[in-house]
């Protein structure tokens, strides 16, 4: 039989949701949307770095970052 400790008693509420899941897809579509937005963000940064995305009037100088 497991021994009860103070630490275990303090951490027990954190584990009270164990095994409970939202039926169906839950928040998976929201996660997918954020993943796509993050991909677009990374692609824009890559294009700025490669100078394949040119923004008029904005000078991009990567030498000052190093």
From Swiss-Prot:
GO terms for cellular component: photosystem II; plasma membrane-derived thylakoid membrane. GO terms for molecular function: phosphate ion binding. GO terms for biological process: photosynthesis; protein stabilization. The keyword Electron transport does not apply. It comes from the Bacteria. It is a single-pass membrane protein. It is found in: Cellular thylakoid membrane. The chain crosses the membrane at residues 29-49. Keywords: Membrane, Photosynthesis, Photosystem II, Thylakoid, Transmembrane, Transmembrane helix. It holds the Pfam family PsbH. InterPro entries: PSII_PsbH (IPR001056), PSII_PsbH_sf (IPR036863). One of the components of the core complex of photosystem II (PSII), required for its stability and/or assembly. PSII is a light-driven water:plastoquinone oxidoreductase that uses light energy to abstract electrons from H(2)O, generating O(2) and a proton gradient subsequently used for ATP formation. It consists of a core antenna complex that captures photons, and an electron transfer chain that converts photonic excitation into a charge separation. PSII is composed of 1 copy each of membrane proteins PsbA, PsbB, PsbC, PsbD, PsbE, PsbF, PsbH, PsbI, PsbJ, PsbK, PsbL, PsbM, PsbT, PsbX, PsbY, PsbZ, Psb30/Ycf12, peripheral proteins PsbO, CyanoQ (PsbQ), PsbU, PsbV and a large number of cofactors. It forms dimeric complexes. Belongs to the PsbH family. This is Photosystem II reaction center protein H. The lineage of its organism: Bacteria, Bacillati, Cyanobacteriota, Cyanophyceae, Synechococcales.
